[in-house]
Swiss-Prot record:
Organism: Yersinia pseudotuberculosis serotype O:1b (strain IP 31758)
UniProt cross-references to HAMAP family, sorted A to Z: Rel_fac_2 (MF_00094)
Annotated localization: Cytoplasm
Function, in words: Peptide chain release factor 2 directs the termination of translation in response to the peptide chain termination codons UGA and UAA.
Predominant location: cytoplasm
Name of protein: Peptide chain release factor 2
Family: Belongs to the prokaryotic/mitochondrial release factor family.
Post-translational modification: Methylated by PrmC. Methylation increases the termination efficiency of RF2.
InterPro entries: PCRF (IPR005139), Pep_chain_release_fac_I (IPR000352), Pep_chain_release_fac_I_sf (IPR045853), PrfB (IPR004374)
Keywords: Cytoplasm, Methylation, Protein biosynthesis
Pfam family, one: RF-1
Amino acid sequence: MFEINPVKNRIQDLSDRTAVLRGYLDYDAKKERLEEVNAELEQPDVWNEPERAQALGKERSTLEEIVTTIDQLEQGLEDVSGLLELAVEADDEETFNETIAELEVLDGKLGQLEFRRMFSGEYDRANCYLDLQAGSGGTEAQDWASMLLRMYLRWAESRGFKTEIIEESDGDVAGLKSATVKIIGEYAFGWLRTETGVHRLVRKSPFDSGGRRHTSFSSAFVYPEVDDDIDIEINPADLRIDVYRASGAGGQHVNKTESAVRITHIPTNIVTQCQNDRSQHKNKDQAMKQLKAKLYEFEMQKKNADKQVLEDNKSDIGWGSQIRSYVLDDSRIKDLRTGVETRNTQAVLDGDLDKFIEASLKAGL
């Protein structure tokens, strides 16, 4: 006798996921549009306008990929349910194993479509920068910023991404006032883009001799690395460039030469800084590259009203734009947008973020 309940549960899970995608991808509208495009492409005079015909061909290919895959999934799930019934009625192990093999194929197809849905943005495949900024709260908030840095570095390592710390500004007693990390690898921005927002920590502070509960905030801001050939006009007169001595980990040159560079774009108040090289010139080039990326993201967010508007004033880190709450006393971390939560707080702080990230991506945030 076979264990059929796990197989039935898996069929139901795949059916539910397919239904979610069907709605999110607006299957009915796409199928209708595909019929219209096919009808246009069948017209004998369609190639009188080659550019129009090519655009229609490209649109058809995109629509077919979605419509055909969902059709195959729905038909496949119906077939596999029938196959399972046959296997049980005939007590046929070979047919039962065939059912499981077919489910694997369907799961793979569905996973590819879910992946496509999650990473459909123009820059999702790009490397990215992650800016971390401690909020008000002094040493406790600065320690929280350093905990977040460690968490994201661990997560990136577990995903096979390379990381490069571009800038670190040490806290007054412990932790960090700010840090910028470059995360290098395919789909780095796609994976991390929904992590932009305020992260709230509640714990008994190790810096409070009375062991009282403290609430601290730190912000994360993720933006893609843009291609050098992207045309972003930057007027040199709009820039304030400061040089200073590097602080934090960085080798023997730290605090000996003014190699660190901070660039402020005065019209937008966007700031970038770099201190990870001995050469002031190289640090300036990197800071300019970050500025270009930030300005590009700023312009994109201005054009797209459905995206979260870039906050010019990073000092306003508080309750308003929270995305996740880390309550360590109660062993509870909860994403305030998706409702996903876990009690394994240490695993999350050690970089186990996938359940939160995947939920936010699947929700289309």
